[in-house]
């Protein structure tokens, strides 16, 4: 596992309660989970794997956004990953994102933000620009609510479908996938 921590994103294929799945997980400890060219390619490869094997895709996001030291190459990953997810959706395969703490920047504004089901972990920070950036933009005359950009606030405003504690994610995701796959069978 030592080498695992030298990567921004991991891709896995396996089974969840008997259902074949493809899964991605971002590593925030690697350059703040920032997405660059290699990470974009990994996300696209995971989507292609899900399409080729007809599996749901589950992504665990945890990122500060795009990798600024890669400049426009990092920013290009936003539309590239969105296009890949749209291909997944054309195949009518379930796409679930679990927003871990934090999920901000280009990740929340691109591939993580267009899931079929959006699950947040309790008290996770979820948003585009960070609290300090927004506060400096609006000036000191206005203050942001205490729960600004928390999973609870994001749920209240309709951007999350549910908040689930990590210990309950496996069973929740399994149930959601089974429901979504049953709905696809009927259509």
Please tell me what each predicted stretch does.
Residues 16-25, 42-67:
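A structural preference for short, pocket-lining loop segments at secondary-structure junctions
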Residues 31-38, 69-73:
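Flexible beta-alpha connector loops of hexameric P-loop NTPases
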Residues 10-16:
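Short acidic-hydrophobic surface loop/beta-edge motif
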Residues 6-7, 33-48:
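Glycine-rich anion/phosphate-binding loops
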Residues 33, 59, 120:
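Redox-cofactor binding/interface segments in oxidoreductases and associated redox assembly factors
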Residues 25-32, 61-66, 90-94:
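Glycine/charged-rich beta-loop-alpha catalytic/anionic-binding loops adjacent to active sites
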Residues 1-5:
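Short, small-residue-biased leader/transition segments that mark boundaries at the very start
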Residues 65-185:
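Conserved catalytic cores of soluble enzyme domains
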């Amino acid at each position: 596992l030592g080498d695992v921590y030298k990567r921004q994103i991991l891709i896995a294929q396996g089974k969840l309660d008997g259902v074949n799945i493809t899964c991605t997980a971002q590593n925030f400890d690697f350059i703040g989970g920032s997405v660059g060219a290699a990470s974009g390619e990994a996300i696209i490869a995971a989507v292609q794997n899900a399409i080729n094997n007809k599996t749901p895709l589950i992504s665990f996001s945890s990122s500060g956004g795009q990798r600024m030291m890669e400049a426009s190459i990092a920013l290009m990953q936003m539309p590239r990953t969105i296009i890949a997810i749209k291909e997944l959706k054309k195949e009518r395969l379930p796409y679930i994102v679990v927003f871990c703490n934090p999920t901000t920047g280009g990740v929340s504004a691109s591939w993580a933000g267009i899931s079929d089901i959006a699950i947040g972990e309790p008290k996770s920070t979820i948003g585009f620009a960070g609290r300090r950036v927004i506060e400096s933009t609006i000036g000191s005359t206005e203050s942001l609510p205490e729960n600004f950009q928390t999973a609870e606030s994001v749920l209240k405003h309709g951007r999350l479908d549910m908040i689930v504690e990590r210990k309950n994610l496996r069973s929740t995701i399994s149930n959601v996938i089974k429901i979504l796959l049953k709905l696809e069978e009927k259509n």
